[in-house]
């Protein structure tokens, strides 16, 4: 008798399934993209026929952080949090089996459609997201990396929180954290300042995510991330670039999220009672945009396959003609990119590089093959420090990646390096900030001298940031080398 596809969801993998090789339990269908620490694949659970997501993590990655992610997912049982089914060790990879969300992340949908979201769509997504945060915070857990790339949608439109690679749990002995972790543009001021933080740090990130969904990118996305880190704690809370495009309810919701004093910031439970969320429409309003995004993805996949087949045929012809193999750069040639267009208001077009920015900062990007190749070349699988000093700031991976991308183009960037070295020499020592913080001497300078100092301020700060980054890497590299040496010794036993 033919077994019908089960209506009940897969709750957990059986003990029998966990003793088998993962290939016996699952059929892996396709690669979905890159998440924190590893690649994510779509697969089918053979016994039940249920589609799942499998994150394959190299064991060289930071196992402590991966185990933390699994531990957090195991403890969660909510419709608004991605479910965990079990895990396997296979050769040098850890396979983490999770709930599959067929529509991908909110940032994927924005990128594929090349459109920002409407207020109604944002409100519906935020309602589910807040319910997920309310659950996590009730369990005394902080997500710490809330952004559009970590909010996944299933095909029905239900939003679920994902990617607990940097999530942490509050305990009685450690009620507040003082480690900088997460993605720079979404980070709360108290997180950047390392003055200790709690669950409402996620609420600030949710406010930034609201602006991201409305405008296509977070505030400060156009400036250097290190400069944003300086600006977020000192500047007033960010707002919409064109507030007149949005209703008072939405503007007030974002304002309540982006309160700089965490003690005065609203909680997830309080925000669920906000009129903007209380009046949110059902998830059915998201089905059209999900269908549109999935259709675009399917068409691009077909076009990519067609181009790859044509290139394979051409390479075979070239080989026959010249008796030499001709290598084709199929990945870069076949990857679709959204055109650069406007980025204003609801249902407006956005620049592709504003959403692609997130992929460099840890957001999963569906079928972004060319970026995957770059990540494999420079080996920047997300790593947080495992020493007692606390995790490494995730945003530092962004700078490492930028450095590695720039290495093959040293000649192209020669002028930039020359400008940097020139700028280092044009600032007299007496232009540095006085150690005692006494700026009275400025009163004696002429207007022209004050103008020159003001113009020189940004280059001076860039220089200080570069010096700081180099000192950081100089201290970090010996620690990583020592860790790698210990791992190699352990593998030899």
UniProtKB/Swiss-Prot annotation:
Signal peptide: none annotated. Residues 26-277 form the Protein kinase domain. GO terms for cellular component: cytoplasm; nucleus. Inhibited by the C-terminal non-catalytic region. Activated by caspase-cleavage. Full activation also requires homodimerization and autophosphorylation of Thr-179. Residues 303-336, 369-414 are annotated as: Disordered. It catalyses: L-seryl-[protein] + ATP = O-phospho-L-seryl-[protein] + ADP + H(+); L-threonyl-[protein] + ATP = O-phospho-L-threonyl-[protein] + ADP + H(+). Residues 308-320, 369-378 have a biased composition (Acidic residues). ATP binds at residues 32-40, 55. Residues 325-336 have a biased composition (Polar residues). The active site is at 145 (proton acceptor). Its main location: cytoplasm. The keyword Metal-binding applies. Belongs to the protein kinase superfamily. STE Ser/Thr protein kinase family. STE20 subfamily. This is Serine/threonine-protein kinase 3. The lineage of its organism: Eukaryota, Metazoa, Chordata, Craniata, Vertebrata. The gene is stk3.
């Amino acid at each position: 008798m033919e077994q019908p596809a089960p209506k009940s969801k897969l709750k957990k993998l059986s003990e029998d399934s966990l003793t088998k090789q993962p290939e016996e339990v699952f059929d892996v269908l396709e690669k979905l993209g890159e998440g924190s620490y590893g690649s994510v694949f779509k697969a089918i659970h053979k016994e039940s026929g249920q589609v799942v997501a499998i994150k394959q993590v190299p064991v060289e990655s930071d196992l402590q952080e991966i185990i933390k992610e699994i531990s957090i997912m195991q403890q969660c049982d909510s419709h608004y949090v991605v479910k965990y089914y079990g895990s396997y060790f296979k050769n040098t990879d850890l396979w983490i089996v999770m709930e599959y969300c067929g529509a991908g992340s909110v940032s994927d949908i924005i990128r594929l459609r090349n459109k920002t979201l409407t207020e109604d769509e944002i409100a519906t997504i935020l309602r589910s997201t807040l319910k997920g945060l309310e659950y996590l915070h009730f369990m005394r857990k902080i997500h710490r990396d809330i952004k559009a790339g970590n909010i996944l949608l299933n095909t029905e439109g239900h939003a679920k929180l994902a990617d607990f690679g940097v999530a942490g749990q509050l305990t009685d002995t450690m009620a507040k954290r003082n480690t900088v972790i997460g993605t720079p543009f979404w980070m709360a001021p108290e997180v950047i300042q390392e003055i200790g933080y709690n669950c409402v740090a996620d609420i600030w990130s949710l406010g930034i995510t609201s602006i991201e969904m409305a405008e296509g990118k977070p505030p400060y996305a156009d400036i250097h991330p290190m400069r944003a880190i300086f600006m977020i704690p000192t500047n007033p809370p960010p707002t919409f670039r064109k507030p007149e495009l949005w209703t008072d309810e939405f503007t007030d919701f974002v304002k309540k999220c982006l309160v700089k004093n965490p003690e005065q910031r609203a909680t997830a439970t309080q925000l669920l009672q906000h009129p903007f969320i209380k009046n949110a429409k059902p998830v059915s309003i998201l089905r059209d945009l999900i269908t549109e995004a999935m259709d675009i993805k399917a068409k691009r996949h077909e076009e990519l396959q067609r181009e790859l087949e044509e290139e394979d045929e051409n390479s075979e012809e070239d080989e026959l003609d010249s008796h030499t193999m001709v290598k084709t750069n199929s990945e870069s040639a076949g990857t679709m990119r959204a055109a650069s267009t406007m980025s204003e208001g609801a249902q407006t077009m956005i620049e592709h590089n504003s959403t692609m920015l997130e992929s460099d900062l840890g957001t999963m990007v569906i079928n972004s093959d060319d970026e995957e190749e770059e990540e494999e070349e420079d080996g920047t699988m997300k790593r947080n420090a495992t020493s007692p000093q606390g995790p490494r700031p995730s945003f530092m991976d962004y700078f490492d990646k930028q450095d590695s991308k720039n290495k093959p183009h040293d000649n192209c960037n020669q002028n930039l390096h020359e400008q940097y070295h020139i700028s280092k020499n044009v600032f007299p020592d007496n232009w540095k900030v006085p150690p005692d913080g006494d700026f009275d001497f400025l009163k004696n300078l002429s207007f022209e001298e004050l103008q020159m100092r003001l113009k020189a301020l940004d280059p001076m700060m860039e220089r200080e940031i570069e010096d700081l980054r180099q000192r950081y890497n100089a201290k970090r590299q010996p620690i990583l080398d020592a860790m790698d040496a210990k791992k190699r010794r352990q593998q030899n036993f």
